[in-house]
């Protein structure tokens, strides 16, 4: 196997592993945790597993818009963006930047799969106490795909602000 083929194989395995873990966790929550109920909590209610559905996007924004507009804004547009992010990840030479883009891509695909095959909404289940920060008692419930996107964005910002700029300023 050539170095390029091995690199693409590793990217494929990374993406499939992340999407599989996300979809498996959502499947298990949807199957075994009653909608709206708390399955269990840890550390004095700091972390909970709770089954909710999100028909909107980030923090349930857009939940009330018309179904056909949702298909355009929450399905078609993200698919085009994901294709672009995947293309960028293949072109990127820096390992941190590539991993960050692949995390964003994998998380986006995980949630697009839910939008395609779960008409009742994306399965969210990770729930954290937020102690009144930003006026929130609890952070909006999320899933592993959401985590991949956020971690990928943070990694990319770190890369852009600290690594890429340092290289460009030399």
From Swiss-Prot:
It catalyses: Release of signal peptides from bacterial membrane prolipoproteins. Hydrolyzes -Xaa-Yaa-Zaa-|-(S,diacylglyceryl)Cys-, in which Xaa is hydrophobic (preferably Leu), and Yaa (Ala or Ser) and Zaa (Gly or Ala) have small, neutral side chains. Pathway: Protein modification; lipoprotein biosynthesis (signal peptide cleavage). It is found in: Cell inner membrane. One of its GO terms (biological process) is proteolysis. The chain crosses the membrane at residues 9-29, 72-92, 94-114, 143-163. It is a multi-pass membrane protein. GO terms for molecular function: aspartic-type endopeptidase activity. Its main location: membrane. It holds the Pfam family Peptidase_A8. One of its GO terms (cellular component) is plasma membrane. The active site is at residues 124, 146. It is an enzyme of class 3 (hydrolase). Keywords: Aspartyl protease, Cell inner membrane, Cell membrane, Hydrolase, Membrane, Protease, Transmembrane, Transmembrane helix. InterPro entries: Peptidase_A8. Its EC number is 3.4.23.36. This protein specifically catalyzes the removal of signal peptides from prolipoproteins. Belongs to the peptidase A8 family. PANTHER family: LIPOPROTEIN SIGNAL PEPTIDASE (PTHR33695:SF1). This is Lipoprotein signal peptidase. The gene is lspA.
């Amino acid at each position: 196997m050539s170095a390029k083929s091995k690199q693409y194989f590793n990217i494929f395995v990374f993406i499939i592993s992340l999407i599989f873990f996300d979809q498996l966790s959502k499947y298990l929550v949807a199957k075994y945790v009653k909608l709206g109920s708390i399955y269990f909590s840890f550390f004095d209610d700091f972390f909970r597993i709770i089954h909710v559905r999100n028909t909107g996007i980030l923090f349930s924004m857009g939940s009330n818009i018309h179904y056909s507009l949702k298909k355009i804004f929450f399905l078609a547009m993200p698919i085009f963006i994901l294709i672009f992010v995947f293309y960028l990840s293949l072109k990127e030479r820096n390992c941190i930047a590539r991993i960050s883009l692949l995390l964003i891509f994998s998380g986006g695909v995980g949630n697009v799969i839910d939008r395609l095959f779960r008409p009742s909404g994306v399965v969210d289940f990770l729930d954290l106490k937020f102690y009144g920060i930003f006026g929130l008692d609890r952070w909006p419930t999320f899933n592993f795909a959401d985590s991949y996107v956020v971690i990928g964005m943070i990694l990319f910002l770190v890369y852009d602000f600290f690594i890429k700029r340092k290289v460009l300023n030399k």
